[in-house]
From Swiss-Prot:
Signal peptide: none annotated. This is Probable RNA-binding protein EIF1AD. It comes from the Eukaryota. GO terms for molecular function: RNA binding; translation initiation factor activity.
Length: 175
């Protein structure tokens, strides 16, 4: 596989698949980048440590601060205590939350990603009044406030024809 094909494959995989958590996986939030593909994360247990990004993600997927990742712990290193297994996008976060595997310490961040939070709606399942058709009482109220006009009330000035000029069609009409 060429480098461009690998990059395209990883980008499509991260953007289109839902990740299934394994028992040893830890969900963590990226706090800062340390450089050299090392990132400081805060995991679901409240521990802060450095994790490495594997070569399959390098130069194809970028991490931002406060983004969520799945970390697989490693035992080899002193400073680097895990490796990024998967980068979670918004859809994956909501999917894991639906499954009931989302950590409670990150619940507030997951709630901000829901459609209701983005629209500023609360959790009551009411339909907004603007989305409903008008009721009979509203139609009566509107008809009382409207003024009716007869044809005789219309000013004569409005009945005059206006000469329209379209520069793309012809010369301007001469008066």
């Amino acid at each position: 596989m060429s480098a461009a094909t690998k990059k395209r494959y990883i980008t499509n995989k991260v953007g289109s698949e839902f990740y299934e958590l394994v028992d040893e996986d830890i969900i963590a939030q990226v706090r800062q980048s340390r450089g050299n593909n090392l990132h400081e994360v805060l995991d679901q247990n409240g521990d802060s440590y450095v994790v490495s990004m594997p070569t399959k993600f390098r130069k194809s997927v970028w991490l931002r601060r406060d983004q969520f990742v799945v970390v697989r712990p490693i035992t080899e290193g002193d400073k680097v205590k895990g490796e990024i297994e998967y980068i979670l996008d918004q859809d994956n976060v909501l999917y894991i939350r639906e499954l009931g595997k989302w950590p409670t310490c990150f619940e507030e961040n997951a709630l901000k990603m829901t459609r209701e939070a983005k629209r500023g709606q609360t959790s009551d399942k009411m339909i907004d009044d603007d989305m409903l058709p008008p009721s009979e009482s509203e139609e009566e109220d509107e008809s009382e406030g409207e003024e009716t006009y007869d044809e005789d009330d219309v000013d004569d000035e409005e009945e005059e024809e206006f000469d329209t000029y379209n520069p793309n069609r012809m010369q301007a009409p001469s008066k």
